[in-house]
Amino acid sequence: MYKDFYASLKPLEGEIPYAEEERLAASGAPLLSWYRKNRRLLPWRENPEPYSVWISEIMLQQTRVEAVKPYFARFMEALPDITSLAQVDEERLLKLWEGLGYYSRARNLKKAAVCLMEDYGGQMPASRDEILKLPGIGSYTAGAVASIAYDLPAPALDGNVVRVLTRLFADPQDSTKPALRKKYERLLEAELVRRTEERESYLSAGDDAGK
């Protein structure tokens, strides 16, 4: 499926500028066109609110998408908002998480929910930097919540997006190097600033194309 996206870039090879910023901007239309036809139907994309985006991103760490789907549905039914998550006892929380593994993720979710109740009035802050302060949230998750739920130009760079950028730029460098990831993060942030609409679709498209 993702190969169709890369194939769609071939007719543009003579037109896409060499500069990485311009090449990234020029690839946006083919990427979104591919995404509209091939996007994965995922429950957390149906209503990308801050809470549901946050829960899904934490669950998806180290866990396959298909495995997460039933857990996400059950978790959201039992704990539909920050308030219920902050108040749940640990035994019930871990029971809901049972089978996903990496139980520190669940414990950090509750810790973060308590912080949100105490410091942010029970709301997820609309700021990547503020989201980063919460327990268990790293750079990617903070960027995903800020950009997908709040439509902010916050980069969310994971392995899938890195694969797309490496292919797009024909970059021979080791994609695990921190310096390269920092460069990609700057490029992605600049593109999100330039792009004033469809930021959520743009980032989701990059994630799907990199599978």
Predicted regions and their residues:
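Active-site neighborhood of HAD-like aspartate-dependent phosphohydrolases
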Residues: 24
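Catalytic cores of DNA base-excision repair glycosylases
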Residues: 8-11, 16-21, 30, 34-211
